[in-house]
């Protein structure tokens, strides 16, 4: 299992566009219907600090995610927006427990 988390702060004027890019990624991921990856994105109270959680069952799921055109477009747009704080990745996480089965 591959678990990654990223946190960054966008400029206030880019926050709505960032959310739209995220919605597109989510729509495309749902359309794939894959059961071997889960992706959640949160925004903090300031409306411009984003936290992404990605859990992939294996390297293949991660590769599919990374190669998704909408995800690549999201990343390019985020970089071009010159965020106040660029994405910072936490060290790779190890699952200790969950209230539900992640990949059944």
PLM regions: where:
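Short amphipathic alpha-helical segments
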Residues: 14-37, 78
């Amino acid at each position: 299992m591959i678990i990654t988390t990223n946190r960054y702060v966008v400029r206030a004027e880019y926050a709505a566009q960032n959310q739209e890019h995220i919605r597109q990624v989510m729509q495309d991921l749902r359309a794939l219907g894959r059961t071997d990856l889960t992706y959640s994105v949160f925004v903090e109270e300031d409306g411009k600090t984003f936290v992404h959680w990605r859990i992939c069952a294996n390297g293949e799921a991660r590769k599919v995610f990374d190669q998704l055109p909408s995800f690549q477009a999201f990343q390019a747009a985020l970089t071009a927006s010159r965020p106040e704080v660029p994405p910072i990745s936490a060290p790779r996480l190890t699952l200790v427990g969950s209230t539900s089965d992640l990949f059944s």
